[in-house]
């Protein structure tokens, strides 16, 4: 077909324009954010899912997911603005930084109660049998220590009085090995690693989710100064998280979630990942508001070991501005 020269030039211009527009759109840079976490278990699965399924990218974010050795390292990363978000429980590390004046706040709550298994050696039949025993933890004041202290408090046990000793072992993969080797007599474990040691003859003294202890089990912490400066970035990040939680809770996505957990947690058997997926599917909160009552419960426990925590008010440690906006926008429906 013949086109006049003017028409040919016009078509050429249109072609160039149509090729430039998608290229410009594709070249739009993603905004980099860093999520840090210390606990190595299924509780962080919502971040793994959001990363692997590109929910962050859908929100224009290049999310880097970084595991750190402990809460102190994570808090230092936030303080230095090397990370923007910290997936964490209400612990001595996170609340300690708040007590010291760092402008941190819980901006979302993913699990709002204590959960996980308190796993013990076969010789331990009841909570009273923990007296005089060694309990494995990751760090004093960290997540596993806090979970353990809340469980002991529930059972009326006091470490000093009952001669219960804490032994710093490592993250949950290492804690599981510590139980198997006999280094410790008991330890808090998430459901995936609990399954691993149960196959070795260890028993679950208590599934802590069944005793309904209020706690900010999994939350997201950020600096208030970051929220003030970049509220849109925080909003987009929490939108991706909310979508991940909803995906996690949909039974139709079970196999996809299991595969993601197996990859990130390097689990040896599918059953271990299934245990984590099933637990988090019911424990994750679709309406991702932080729990003031759960934070208050931790402040109470921490005040026993350090008076600096007694001055904290739980209401001052949460910032709901982003999740309230998401709720108004219908994100949690």
Name each model feature, range by range.
Residues 11-22:
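Bacterial N-terminal signal peptides
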Residues 83, 87, 280-294, 325-331:
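Short amphipathic alpha-helical segments at helix boundaries and their inter-helical linkers
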Residues 299-333:
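Conserved C-terminal helix/tail region of periplasmic/extracytoplasmic solute-binding proteins
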Residues 2-12:
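Bacterial N-terminal signal peptides that target proteins for export
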Residues 228-310:
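Secondary-structure end/capping motifs
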Residues 92, 173-265:
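Pocket-lining segment of extracytoplasmic ligand-binding domains
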Residues 27-171, 175-181, 185-191, 205-208, ...:
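Short, glycine-/small- and polar/acidic-enriched structural segments
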Residues 21, 48, 95, 149, ...:
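Predominant activation on well-ordered alpha-helical scaffold segments within soluble catalytic domains
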